[in-house]
A protein has these predicted regions:
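Binuclear metal-dependent phosphoesterase catalytic core
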Residues: 2-3, 9, 80-84, 151, ...
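Conserved acidic residues
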Residues: 33-35, 137
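Conserved catalytic scaffold of divalent metal-dependent phosphoesterases
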Residues: 6-20, 27-28, 41-140, 144-156
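Juxtamembrane helix-loop transition sites at the ends of transmembrane segments
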Residues: 32, 61, 110-113, 164, ...
Length: 208
């Protein structure tokens, strides 16, 4: 895809769940012009390998309310950029504060008892963010650990999925191509083993 290429990723949870950035992430994002991380880093130092590829912008996620972030709480909640004629907004997608932490717990419980799924979570987040940021042409979010691409009116909403996936999830990143009047997304599965603190292949925590 021609144009300005943005690498997208979210929910890496390094070093609490993954020890370091998986090589598959660096391979998938090699050659991009810019990288956006949509929250739950957890330690901003984990972004350094990405900076060797391209400039990086990152936002904080819901995990930072628990003081597990090793400085991640200092990251901004929202970043807005003008890229190739598109206004791109980056945020984690969670409700802020203690309410967001409580709602996330309810959502995880509902998924465990099969009252809802991550696709529905993305659907709800997209419909909350689109009217909240009407000036944005592209909204990039994370939080659900599940990829999502949807257009609501003129807006493109993208969740690249999670790098730190649970045993039931496929880890993914994304590449967003922007040119004048055009925005396209490729979701990229990560097939190589992750370097996890808990299992040989995937993170094994149900908490997001």
């Amino acid at each position: 895809m021609p144009g300005f290429v943005v690498g997208l990723l979210s929910d890496t949870h390094i070093p609490r769940r993954l020890r370091r950035m998986p090589p598959a992430v660096l391979e998938a994002l090699d050659g991009v012009d810019l990288i956006l991380h949509a929250g739950d880093v957890d330690d901003p130092a984990a972004l350094e390998p990405l900076r060797a590829l391209a400039p990086v912008y990152a936002v904080r996620g819901n995990i930072h309310i628990q003081d597990f972030s090793d400085g991640g709480a200092a990251l901004p909640a929202v970043v807005t950029l003008q890229i190739a004629g598109h206004r791109v907004l980056l945020t984690h997608g969670h409700h802020p504060g203690v309410l967001g932490f409580f709602l996330k717990g309810l959502d995880v419980f509902a998924q465990c008892v099969r009252l809802t799924d991550k696709g529905q979570t993305n659907w709800r987040i997209a419909r909350r963010l689109a009217p909240l940021y009407p000036e944005a042409d592209v909204i990039v979010f994370g939080h659900s650990h599940w990829p999502h691409v949807e257009r609501i009116g003129r807006q493109l909403l993208v969740n690249p999925g999670a790098v730190c996936a649970t045993s039931s999830e496929q880890p993914t990143v994304a590449r967003l191509c922007l040119s004048e009047g055009v925005s396209e997304v490729d979701i990229i599965p990560l097939t190589q083993p992750q370097v996890s603190n808990q299992t040989p292949t995937f993170c094994n925590s149900t908490q997001r």
